[in-house]
A protein has these predicted regions:
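Conserved P-loop NTPase motor cores
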Residues: 1-122, 153-172
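Acidic, polar loop-rich interaction surfaces within structured domains
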Residues: 104-105, 128, 139
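Small/polar glycine-rich anion-binding or flexible loop at a beta-alpha turn
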Residues: 113-116, 130, 140-141
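P-loop NTPase catalytic cores that bind/hydrolyze ATP
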Residues: 135-163
């Protein structure tokens, strides 16, 4: 990846005044298992201005944390989208639960006493709860995914079944 980004930056800066005329999108599968540029966090933070984007694919947050110890959160922060497909890692469950945030629950409590002067009361209370707890994230249906897009509310949706794609038959698995 080092040579790729050096070349793309060089061409964008020297030949096209800072931005590539045709956007380049890098799909970086098995990202933690390949040699990465030492300054990848800086590259990720500046590539958009040059017409370069990437999809970083990892199995779990722990892989990223092991590689980038102190800067892994800044790497995630430089990504406008985060797609969670499920997993079996406690730290990942907690992370996704925190990203989802909380919801407000309105609770009404009714009370009545019987007797001579009988009284009746209604209490309203608001409490907060995680949208999904880490345990609920762990038990997420395998057909579901959670998508986070910067500036938007999270979306839980069905995963796309690749076997339904018209060109699936042309793949190795088809």
């Amino acid at each position: 990846y080092s040579n790729l980004f050096q070349t793309l930056y060089y061409v964008a800066d020297r030949k096209y005044g800072g931005r590539l005329p045709i956007p380049v999108h890098c799909i970086m599968d098995e990202w933690p298992n390949v040699a990465l540029p030492d300054d990848f966090d800086k590259i990720l933070a500046t590539m958009r201005s040059r017409g370069i984007s990437c999809s970083i694919i990892i199995q779990n947050i722990a892989q990223m944390k092991a590689l980038f110890k102190d800067s892994y959160e800044s790497l995630i922060g430089n990504c406008d989208e985060f797609l969670y497909l499920g997993g079996n890692e406690k730290e990942g469950h907690k992370y996704v639960s925190e990203l989802l945030g909380k919801e407000t629950l309105d609770t009404n409590t009714y009370g009545q006493t019987k007797g001579r002067s009988g009284s009746y009361s209604v209490n309203y209370q608001q409490t907060g709860r995680e949208l999904l707890t880490p345990d609920e994230i762990r038990l997420l249906d395998n057909r579901k995914a959670i998508l986070f897009i910067r500036g938007e509310r999270p979306i839980m949706d069905d995963k796309y079944d690749l076997k339904k794609h018209v060109n699936f038959r042309y793949t190795e698995d088809g």
